[in-house]
Amino acid sequence: WVTGRELHVANTGAPLSAAGVRSLTALRVSAKAGHRPGARDIGARDIGARDIGAAATDAADIGPVEAGVGGDDETPPAVGRFGVGFTATATIADTVEIRSRSGSVLFDRARTWAEIETIGVAGALTARQVPLLRLVWESSRGPADGFDTEIVLTVRAGIDLDGLLVGMIAEAPDLLLELTALSEIDIAGTRFVIHRRPHPEVPDVGTAIVRGGGAGERAWLVAHGRSASWLVETDATGAPVVAGSDVLRAPTPTDIELSLPARCITTLALTPDRRRVHPDADLSGVADGYLSLMLALAPASRPALIPRIGLARNDIDAAITAAVLAEVTDGRWLPTVADGDGVPGRAVLFADLTAPLADALGDLVGGLVCVEVSSPTWLPVLRAVGVDEIGLAGIADRLAGADRPPRWWWKLYDALSPLVFGPIEVEALGALPVPRTDGRLNFGARGLLIPRIPGTRACWITGPDPEVV
């Protein structure tokens, strides 16, 4: 909220500690339990509304306000441990006060400049160049009622406070998804709430519902892996709303563009400016959890999460895409007619498969992809993960040794007939087995005689069994 030229950001949870103050004045990662190596404070740069809000909460850990999906009972969720970067506050303010129930401190650029002038070390510095977060003074003011810590920024003239709040409101839903310790954000009376619950069927997957801001609600599936969480928004039917383009988040956005269809929030080590992945970061486990995200979707929607090859925006995007493709290629997630969820490399797809044809072929064509996923639309992405395509000729070949009663063959022909439009399809089915009157199979209908009187059986006539005619 805003009062005059003061921007207030308050939270609940663990209060400010002496170690935290020392870390803030040293401009390094804050000494907080569970802190991830490689997370560092950001430097002065162009800061967005999201950075200001997240950086202010970095001054104190947030306690467990709501049970998060996949949470650890022994380690409470935290915001500050991520080192979002408290130095972002210095880009819009010359005075920053941290009011906490354990004690309060004040950073003041003018007072710092006065101290520098007093000891005669100002040199070529100007008052504007003096670092804000180096010297700290004690403050006697406590946080607002109902909060454990409050950050008060006296915003410089010329900065549009209303515009800053509008930006924060726009970014609040994403911030709730990225910082899992948060359950609610209120920005000048505009309230956002997130509700998390575990998925009823898939372990390590949950749903997150974000409400508020006058925009209704948005639902997300969230899968947790070793070094990343994977998210995809879903519509009212549960189908994925695939991301067109996004950036890697750790947990808030970096500058690394991603072309993946799902959002990635990683714990990978970053460079000091928190904009790039550290050169020594281990990407081997980043795809862990992606398969669980796919399994949480309805079978017909799962191929939507297969990454498109050749669209990588940068080397990190290419590496993560390759890891995800390897996970998807080797995993058991593709719904098949007879075998449940199967491995793509052992599956075959017949484009425009119908339910009657699937019922007839399911136990004869191993790994036949189910009807819901047999649209030609999915064929290019399914090929990328090892799925083979089968046509009418392939079906005929695979039925060469089938031992089925004549009535079964009649049902098969009936299921195939809507797919035969002309001589091309007839030629493709030229070797389709036909049961004969003598109990044997004929490969194709050529050479078979059909009696003039329907239902007639004559052993001396080489014709199709009457039950299939």
Regions found by a protein language model. Give the residues of each.
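Acidic/polar loop patches that form or flank catalytic/metal-binding clefts of enzymes
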Residues: 98-108, 184-186, 301-305
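Short, conserved charged micro-motifs
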Residues: 159-166
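A broad structural signal for short, well-ordered beta-strand segments within beta-sheet-rich domains
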Residues: 4, 93-95, 176-190
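Generic structural motif
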Residues: 12-14, 70-72, 103, 110-114, ...
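Amphipathic alpha-helical coiled-coil/helical-bundle segments that mediate oligomerization/assembly
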Residues: 131, 137, 150, 155-157, ...
